[in-house]
Swiss-Prot record:
One matching Pfam family: AIRS
GO molecular function, one term: phosphoribosylamine-glycine ligase activity
Cellular localization per UniProt: Cytoplasm
CDD domains, A to Z: PurM (cd02196)
UniProt keyword Secreted present: no
Protein name according to UniProt: Phosphoribosylformylglycinamidine cyclo-ligase
Pathway assigned to this chain's UniProt record: Purine metabolism; IMP biosynthesis via de novo pathway; 5-amino-1-(5-phospho-D-ribosyl)imidazole from N(2)-formyl-N(1)-(5-phospho-D-ribosyl)glycinamide: step 2/2
Reaction(s) the record says it catalyses: 2-formamido-N(1)-(5-O-phospho-beta-D-ribosyl)acetamidine + ATP = 5-amino-1-(5-phospho-beta-D-ribosyl)imidazole + ADP + phosphate + H(+)
Superkingdom of this protein's organism: Bacteria
Keyword Cell inner membrane: no
PANTHER family, alphabetized: TRIFUNCTIONAL PURINE BIOSYNTHETIC PROTEIN ADENOSINE-3 (PTHR10520:SF12), TRIFUNCTIONAL PURINE BIOSYNTHETIC PROTEIN ADENOSINE-3-RELATED (PTHR10520)
The protein's Enzyme Commission number: 6.3.3.1
Length: 343
């Protein structure tokens, strides 16, 4: 008996690395030293920082993977993975430098996982960060056939004096919401339960979704905010804090970027609520409060700016190609999000 008979094909693993090599190396920045295949990845710190601080983040894609695997559509999952990590690192003002991935599966399917890596490559290119390395684990008996899991790791850099940690936020500051591309990568356990309980299929075309299938809309990749936000910071736009709206929605994530004694008042429906959220609420009979506590509700990232700079911020970000809305303001409070009706 050998390792291959036990379910681990080392040669297939080598072939997979060669299959993805060109794409991976296309993401390299000038600071990358060496190439793919070493025990570690080398990255030289960029020049021009007086007191550079490294910022790290790690995340996954959750049960959105179940939909991708059910539909055999894997190319957008890699973008999700990168976005979940780089958007987090971005919130303190850091520029993402490099990314690492971990892929685990029961039996290596080179085409399936190369589709995933192709998405990771695209996400890294769009974010300006290098795919510095990764691990592909073939674990027979651990995952059902055709299933896999992914995790990502990102490291960024920020000047110490420019770290956005909430201490710059003032009462009266304005919350600018940046549009999400859809559900992003959170809340999918609830979505999957709704589909199961109602006897629906990913190929269904609900009237609310304007001809698109449910699967197509749900697999829309997570929006990457890196380039527009870095451009805003580099232009000198006065940004006091930022938040990535992930699991827990606005109520869970906005308070993470505030100072003590502060809350945020959000004006309900002061932005475009995407049809997919209306569909989820209707099909699942979910209360507005629960929707806000589970999903991003059309706002994937929030920038806090002084009131006199709010319109400038909206205009600048929209010129970067992303919809931006004034969605609320910072008020005195105990680290809460207060959602006020716009009716």
């Amino acid at each position: 008996m050998d390792y291959r008979e036990a379910g681990v094909d080392i040669q297939a693993g080598r072939s997979f690395v060669e299959k993805i090599r060109q794409g991976v190396e296309s993401t390299y920045r000038r600071e990358v030293l060496g190439g793919l295949g070493g025990f570690g990845g080398y990255f030289e710190l960029p020049q021009g920082y007086q007191h550079p601080v490294l910022v790290s983040g790690t995340d996954g894609v959750g049960t959105k993977l179940k939909i991708a695997q059910a539909l055999n559509q894997h190319h957008t999952i890699g973008i999700d993975l990168v976005a979940m990590c780089v958007n987090d690192v971005l919130t303190c003002g850091a520029e993402p430098l490099f990314f690492l991935d971990y892929l685990a599966t029961g039996k290596l399917n080179p085409q399936q996982l190369s589709d995933v890596v192709q998405g990771i490559v695209e996400g890294c290119r769009l974010s300006g960060c290098a795919l510095l390395g990764g691990e592909t684990a073939e674990m027979p008996g651990f995952y059902p056939v055709g299933e896999y899991d992914v995790a990502g790791f990102c490291v960024g850099i920020v000047e110490k004096s420019k770290i956005l940690d909430g201490s710059q936020v003032n009462i009266g500051d304005i919350a600018i919401g940046l549009a999400s591309s859809g559900v992003h990568s959170n809340g999918f356990s609830l979505v999957r339960k709704i589909v199961e309980v109602n006897g629906l299929n990913w190929s269904d075309r609900p009237q609310l979704l304007n001809g698109q299938t449910l699967g197509e809309v749900l697999l829309t990749p997570t929006q990457l905010y890196v380039k527009p936000i870095l451009n805003a910071l580099n232009s000198g736009l006065d940004i006091h804090a930022m938040a990535h709206i992930t699991g827990g929605g606005l109520p869970e994530n906005l308070p993470r970027c505030l100072d003590k004694g502060q809350s945020v008042e959000i004006i309900d429906k002061s932005w475009n609520i995407l049809p997919i959220f209306q569909w989820i609420a209707q099909q699942g009979q979910i209360s507005p409060a629960s929707m806000y506590e589970t999903f991003n509700m059309g706002i994937g990232f929030v920038v806090i700016v002084p009131p006199e700079k709010a319109q400038l911020a909206v205009n600048f970000l929209e010129n970067q190609g992303i919809l931006a809305y004034e969605i609320g303001k910072v008020i005195e409070g105990k680290g809460e999000v207060v959602i006020e009706s716009n009716d």
